[in-house]
């Protein structure tokens, strides 16, 4: 009866590992898409910056605000790119501090450290069901820590690009106000 319980628990842990790995993959894809959005935003803005430079008859205060907004947009896009890259690039430093085991039958890092497939097979056969369950629980924990870290970086990257778009909206409003002032005069 105990063996059946372990098999169900192992199956559940396998499902948890697959789900968490799916979250990690999805976050990587979203971060890559956000990098593309950042690149497109920076390209479009750099090509259209001239349309905003001479507004309000080159008023000194407007020019200061204009350059301040451009600086802020650049910083916000840079921070979004940086955090998107941090979200994509694997970082196991924080996880290794929480987990010291160097002998896993589930982790690709430790599977690849075997001499060959036969060596891994022998090692795998020697593992008890309790040991396999413990190994899978440790892998679930590690993947969950990685997924959480990726989510935090991605969420932060999104908040930075939102700030950049808020500044861009302010520039567009300035352009609209200048257009209305010119049309009414």
Swiss-Prot record:
<comment type="function">
    <text>Pycsar (pyrimidine cyclase system for antiphage resistance) provides immunity against bacteriophage. The pyrimidine cyclase (PycC) synthesizes cyclic nucleotides in response to infection; these serve as specific second messenger signals. The signals activate the adjacent effector, leading to bacterial cell death and abortive phage infection. A clade E Pycsar system.</text>
</comment>
<feature type="transmembrane region" description="Helical">
    <location>
        <begin position="32"/>
        <end position="52"/>
    </location>
</feature>
<comment type="function">
    <text>The effector component of a two-gene Pycsar system. Expression of this and adjacent cytidylate cyclase EcPycC (AC P0DV24) confers resistance to bacteriophage P1 and T5; this protein is required for resistance. When cells expressing the Pycsar system are infected by phage T5 at low multiplicity of infection (0.2 MOI) the culture survives, at 2.0 MOI bacteria enter growth arrest. The same cells enter growth arrest after exposure to 250 uM cCMP but not cUMP; this effector protein responds only to cCMP, usually produced by its cognate NTP cyclase.</text>
</comment>
<keyword id="KW-0812">Transmembrane</keyword>
<feature type="transmembrane region" description="Helical">
    <location>
        <begin position="141"/>
        <end position="161"/>
    </location>
</feature>
<protein>
    <recommendedName>
        <fullName>Pycsar effector protein EcPycTM</fullName>
    </recommendedName>
</protein>
<keyword id="KW-1003">Cell membrane</keyword>
<dbReference type="GO" id="GO:0000166">
    <property type="term" value="F:nucleotide binding"/>
</dbReference>
<dbReference type="GO" id="GO:0051607">
    <property type="term" value="P:defense response to virus"/>
</dbReference>
<keyword id="KW-1133">Transmembrane helix</keyword>
<keyword id="KW-0051">Antiviral defense</keyword>
<keyword id="KW-0547">Nucleotide-binding</keyword>
<keyword id="KW-0472">Membrane</keyword>
<dbReference type="GO" id="GO:0005886">
    <property type="term" value="C:plasma membrane"/>
</dbReference>
<keyword id="KW-0997">Cell inner membrane</keyword>
<feature type="transmembrane region" description="Helical">
    <location>
        <begin position="63"/>
        <end position="83"/>
    </location>
</feature>
């Amino acid at each position: 009866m105990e063996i059946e319980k372990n098999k169900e628990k192992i199956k559940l842990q396998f499902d948890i590992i697959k789900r968490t790995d799916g979250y990690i993959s999805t976050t990587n894809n979203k971060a890559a898409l956000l990098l593309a959005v950042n690149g497109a935003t920076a390209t479009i803005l750099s090509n259209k910056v001239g349309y905003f430079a001479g507004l309000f008859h080159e008023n000194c205060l407007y020019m200061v605000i204009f350059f301040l907004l451009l600086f802020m947009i650049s910083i916000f896009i840079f921070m979004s790119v940086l955090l998107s890259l941090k979200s994509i690039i694997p970082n196991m430093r924080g996880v290794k501090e929480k987990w010291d085991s160097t002998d896993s039958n589930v982790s690709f890092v430790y599977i690849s450290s075997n001499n060959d497939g036969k060596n891994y097979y022998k090692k795998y056969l020697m593992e008890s069901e309790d040991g396999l369950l413990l190994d899978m629980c440790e892998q679930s924990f590690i993947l969950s820590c990685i997924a959480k870290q990726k989510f935090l970086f991605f969420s932060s990257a999104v908040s930075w690009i939102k700030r950049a778009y808020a500044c861009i909206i302010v520039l567009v409003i300035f352009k609209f106000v200048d257009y209305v002032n010119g049309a009414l005069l």
